[in-house]
């Protein structure tokens, strides 16, 4: 393990955040002086960011904790173009109104892990629409475009893989890397930002910005990326039967967030404690050393600390208590996630397969049938044995809900609206 001069790189290294860096020595010297102003860009493609974005948010958190300045760059401009990285087909074009709505929905989450203000290491939030939407086409081609080699652009994974598969790539997508590179140079001029961070899939785009800065006479710029986030079994992290693990509470409840971490594979507990909590490394070391059934206690700590960081300590403790009552006492907890269905549908008989799909506990009717055969689905704690069963008002508990369960740990309440 390399010993760095800066707290920033030492923290990232011991916690497992580092995948690639364009110049460790130069960045280390900059960070040691508290001059490593850095940014991460977040496109506004959805109403919420997801768990993959949370990883880079934690990098910004540790940057700030080590005395350097973080910038969160909202992609109001780049979202109009669409990042082709990791995509097999062109992204759907979003209207300006949709992008603005997404941006407003997203922006509040950053203050959960960053301190904003006017101080030397206080975070700032900018939007690349401020400069990208004002660019003159001819000036852009002459002043910026001439520094890009199409030969090199064709070797980037986001482009090369599409071409190898004979999948269409639009001209607007092809220009995404130009926009991202220009962002880096513009931020360097405006704020003195010298570091861009991102996921490993962004390495090529970030390096384009480093090179553009050199060609346009900007100070030396740096690139730093995180590893691809996967579980010990090799699966891409961040998906559940309900879909993506969103960061906004109205799209993925604190209880679901807590449960997501509680269900971590044994081999991943230590890694995720380092990446998604701020617990001291000494405490994480003790939790990593737990074995057998004791590893479940470490999972509860992971779930509570990760949830507290994003949703607050009260929400984390409430989620932990709800889980304890539900799983240890078998109680029907009112704070379980709830899905509403029209009262008329329930009165007419709501198919049990449809109910489990609508609740997000299974992905399809076929999966629901397979789980019923295996005894994995329950209604009000009673096993479902007939896939033609219909839920009705007769299934409502005294609390006016129907409890659906998948296995021992996944529960949803159905409530007539």
UniProtKB/Swiss-Prot annotation:
Annotated function: Catalyzes the attachment of tyrosine to tRNA(Tyr) in a two-step reaction: tyrosine is first activated by ATP to form Tyr-AMP and then transferred to the acceptor end of tRNA(Tyr).
The protein's name: Tyrosine--tRNA ligase
Description of how the protein assembles with itself and partners: Homodimer.
Compartment(s) of residence: Cytoplasm
Domain spans labelled S4 RNA-binding: 350-417
E.C. numbers: 6.1.1.1
Source lineage: Bacteria, Pseudomonadati, Pseudomonadota, Alphaproteobacteria, Hyphomicrobiales
PANTHER family, per the entry: TYROSINE--TRNA LIGASE, MITOCHONDRIAL, TYROSYL-TRNA SYNTHETASE
Motif, 'HIGH' region: chain positions: 44-53
HAMAP family assigned to the protein according to its UniProt record, in alphabetical order: Tyr_tRNA_synth_type1
